[in-house]
Design a protein with these regions (language model features):
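Membrane-spanning helices that line or support transport/gating and their immediate boundary helices
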Residues: 43-48, 108-115, 158, 206-214
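Transmembrane alpha-helices
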Residues: 131-165, 188-196, 200, 204, ...
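Transmembrane-helix boundary motif in ABC transporter permease subunits
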Residues: 33-67
Length: 220
């Protein structure tokens, strides 16, 4: 009956609940850490890359081409590279997400900065504010909601990506899922892990949507 089936599912060691949930947590941490670190690095670099913030064309172009390079290399390729460099594990996954998202965030952030309303910045400058204060009070309030919204979207997206790159050795539940599929035997465990991944992505997608709607609402 149903109670016996549930008891077998919970108590049967073949399901490997502890290891599966640990690997799932690794995947979540990989996505979160890679996204946060990338956004923290891209934030100051975007100010240097934006033409209206840093009037140095050479520096602007160098940084923009750097962003293009980072994001043009697929995350899976970065994962393979860092798996060879650091060995299999979450560090390779975090590094792959970090490199890819630094390029993506750098491009998105710098474009957002280049499209700000200069009137607000000029208003702060007109009262004699220092250059750093002009950016702090005239620019950051305009772009911060956009930056946070974009970061939240990629955090949710990277939760899925972390599963995929895990299959090439970057750790997390993706690697465990791939190992279970290769044996061509434990299809119950495969279905179990797939359901958990879908559940986590669904939850994170809804959290991300709610937070982004609130940020957009505050901005408007």
């Amino acid at each position: 009956n149903l109670s016996l089936a549930w008891s077998n599912f919970v108590n049967n060691a073949d399901w490997q609940h502890g290891d599966v949930w640990l690997k799932l947590l690794q995947t979540i941490v990989m996505a979160f850490a890679g996204t946060v670190l990338a956004s923290l690095l891209a934030f100051p670099l975007a100010f240097v890359a934006a033409r209206n913030i840093m009037p140095n064309r050479l520096l602007n172009q160098v940084l923009k081409r750097f962003f293009d390079f980072l994001r043009s290399v697929d995350m899976l390729i970065w994962a393979l590279f860092f798996t060879r460099a650091f060995g299999p594990g979450p560090l390779a996954g975090i590094s792959a997400i970090f490199f890819t998202d630094t390029g993506t965030f750098g491009k998105l952030y710098s474009e957002a900065l280049e499209n700000i309303d200069d009137k607000q910045r000029e208003g702060v400058r007109s009262v004699g504010a220092s250059p750093s204060s002009v950016q702090r009070y005239g620019v950051v309030p305009q772009v911060l909601p956009v930056f946070l919204s974009q970061s939240l979207y990629f955090w949710e997206s990277n939760t899925r990506s972390a599963t995929i790159i895990g299959a090439v050795g970057a750790g997390g539940i993706g690697l465990k899922l791939w190992e279970a599929m290769r044996t061509n035997q434990d299809w119950e465990n495969v279905a179990y892990m797939v359901m958990l991944i879908l559940l986590v992505v669904f939850v994170f997608d809804n959290i991300s949507n709610v937070l982004r709607q609130r940020l957009i609402g505050k901005q408007s």
